[in-house]
């Protein structure tokens, strides 16, 4: 009898451990999906709709910018969006894919500043804290007229 009780306790502990691990994974996935949705909304409002104030609703109490052509903070973001609105009012960025790793969201983007042009391939990396964007990095690569291969950049 003692052996049966001990075996049942081991099975119960194993099931509880697996349940807790599964719940933690689902919670992480839910938070990661929330982070993805935050960044996608931020990107759409800012880069496509060119509405800096609407985009800044998704930004935390700081915004650290690693792009050397844009300043830190909400004012730097407003200036960048103002530049896009003034110089490239018809620009559009199409997010080809997104990846999430905890508090980091990575976007692979086809950005076209002038309709009809080839545009740029961009990888944007955003860091979130408490569900808000607080940091941004990007790398930009012009799409060549004549590529060395038949693969696309997307």
Feature map (PLM): residue ranges:
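Bacterial N-terminal signal peptides that target proteins for export
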Residues: 1-12
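C-terminal and inter-domain tail/linker signature
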Residues: 18, 22-154
